[in-house]
Design a protein with these regions (language model features):
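A short beta-sheet element
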Residues: 1-53, 64-79
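Amphipathic alpha-helical coiled-coil/heptad-repeat segments
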Residues: 42-43, 47, 58-60, 64-68, ...
Length: 140
């Protein structure tokens, strides 16, 4: 996803995020401040995520997005950007190497959120004495 955060006339800095594996949610709804970039190939999406953040593409997006009174980009603007073919052996190899890492990062992010909920539930009870460590049964 490409999105704008803040900005003022003549000034546009795009931001990027990556999603998948249920992160941040299984279903999402977006508004006009978010541009969904899904190239229908997970490996190619990962390549595009990093490629879009290169100085060359960032300068292109800054230039395109900063021309309007309300900074931003549209579908036509993104479709005009140069990008390597998904058939390139280098792009395919990049996806093969990097995609497993991205999937692990996204999966770990979900696990971190679950663990934070458990911590936030248990810690106040432990601190107040409502729950004692020796009272907690553990699985063996």
């Amino acid at each position: 996803m490409i999105y704008k955060d803040g900005g003022k006339p003549g000034y546009f800095i795009p931001n990027f995020t990556i999603f998948g594996e249920g992160f941040p949610f299984n279903e999402m709804y977006i508004n006009e401040h978010v541009f969904l970039l899904d190239l229908m190939d997970c490996g190619y999406n990962v390549f595009a995520y990093f490629y879009m953040q290169t100085p060359y593409i960032m300068n292109q997006l800054n230039s395109i997005g900063g021309k309007a009174a309300i900074p931003g980009i549209n579908t036509k603007d993104v479709e005009c950007l140069p990008i390597y073919s998904n058939e390139s052996p280098y792009v395919k190899k990049f996806g093969e190497i990097v995609l497993p890492f991205i999937k692990t990062i996204l999966s770990n992010s979900l696990e971190n959120a679950k663990q934070a909920k458990v911590r936030d539930t248990l810690l106040p009870k432990l601190m107040s004495g409502e729950l004692k460590i020796n009272e907690i049964e553990t699985e063996k």
